[in-house]
Amino acid sequence: MALEHLRIASRRSQLAMVQTNWVKAELEKAHPGLAISVEAMATQGDKILDVALAKIGDKGLFTKELEAQMLVGRAEIAVHSLKDLPTNLPEGLMLGCITEREDPADALVVNSKNAEYTLETLPEGSIVGTSSLRRLAQLRYHYPHLQFKDVRGNVITRLEKLDSGNYDCLILAAAGLSRLGFGDRIHQSIPGNISLHAVGQGALGIECVCDRPEVMELIQVLNHAPTSARCLAERAFLRVLEGGCQVPIGVNTQIEGDTIQLTGMVASLDGKRLIRDEQAGPLADPEAVGRDLAHKLKDQGAGEILQEIFEMERGQ
C-alpha cells in the first residue's frame, strides 16, 4: 500500500533542522504527492551541556529519543548526522540509506586575534576548543605544546565563545559549518595525516523501521552508493573495535575503480600512542574491508588502548 504521509523524527538543533529540512525537500521533489511532516525534539545530548560528552558515556546520546518515536509508531524515519548514529541499532530499526557526503574533514576556526596562524604555527599554550576525544588525541600527538579545552553547545554558541576570547581556536566539522552558512569561518582544512575524521562524518544517515518496505522504497532516492560504501566500511571498522561516538577512532576512505581503501587510527587520550594502518579490498564488500582493518589494528595494540579508556570512563 502506498504511503500517503511520511513523518520524520529529528533533533531540534539548528544544524539538525537544516539537515532534516533538506531531506524533506528532496523527498517532496521526488514524491510530489507525498505529505511529509517533521517531529523535532531534544535528545539527551542536547540537554546535558555542562558535562563533557565522553563523561556521559552513552552511545545513543543524540539518537535514542528519535528511535523511540519510530518504535512506537509516531515516525517512519529519523534523520541523523551519521557520525552520531551507533553501529548497533535497536531491534526493529535499520539504516535505510546514506546521503552523499559533504567534506568530511575537520576544520580549524580562529578568532580575529589569531587570524595569522595555522594549526602548525599556533603559539605554545594556545587554547584549542574541541569536544571530540578523537580530535583531542590526534592533536595532542602532533601538537603537544598546545592546550586543549572542552567546548559544548551548538555551532553558533561555540563560535560566540571563540569570538569572546574563551578560546584561541576551535576544531569543528567542515560539513556542519558549511551547512549552517559558516563556510567562510573555515580558516584551515586539517589534512588527514594530522586528523583522520570520524566514522560517517559529513554524511547523513536515514534510519527507518525494518518492516516497512514502502518506506525503504521512498527514501532510496537519497542513497548515494559511493558514500554508502565508504561509510559501511567505516562503520564495520568501528563496530569490531566496539567503539562509540566518544572514542579516539578516526578514518579516511577512498575508492579507486572497484577497490576501496580504508585508513584507520586508534590513539590514547594523552596523545602518546597512536596506531594507524590501512586496508584495501573489493568495493563490492566494504564491510569486510572495515572488519579486516579493525583486526589488524587490534593485533597492533588498539584493543588495549580502548580498554584503558573504557576502564577510565567507568571509574569516573
UniProtKB/Swiss-Prot annotation:
Keywords on record: Chlorophyll biosynthesis, Porphyrin biosynthesis, Transferase
Pathway: Porphyrin-containing compound metabolism; protoporphyrin-IX biosynthesis; coproporphyrinogen-III from 5-aminolevulinate: step 2/4; Porphyrin-containing compound metabolism; chlorophyll biosynthesis
Keyword field contains Transferase: yes
UniProt-listed Enzyme Commission number(s): 2.5.1.61
One Pfam short name: Porphobil_deam
Entry GO MF terms: hydroxymethylbilane synthase activity
Residues bearing the modification S-(dipyrrolylmethanemethyl)cysteine: C245
Cofactor: dipyrromethane
GO cellular component, one term: cytoplasm
GO BP term, pick one: chlorophyll biosynthetic process
Catalytic reactions of this protein: 4 porphobilinogen + H2O = hydroxymethylbilane + 4 NH4(+)
GTP-binding recorded as keyword: no
Superkingdom: Bacteria
Cofactor note: Binds 1 dipyrromethane group covalently.
Function: Tetrapolymerization of the monopyrrole PBG into the hydroxymethylbilane pre-uroporphyrinogen in several discrete steps.
Subunit structure: Monomer.
Note: The porphobilinogen subunits are added to the dipyrromethane group.
UniProt family annotation: Belongs to the HMBS family.
HAMAP family: Porphobil_deam
Protein name per Swiss-Prot or TrEMBL: Porphobilinogen deaminase
Organism, as annotated: Synechococcus sp. (strain CC9311)
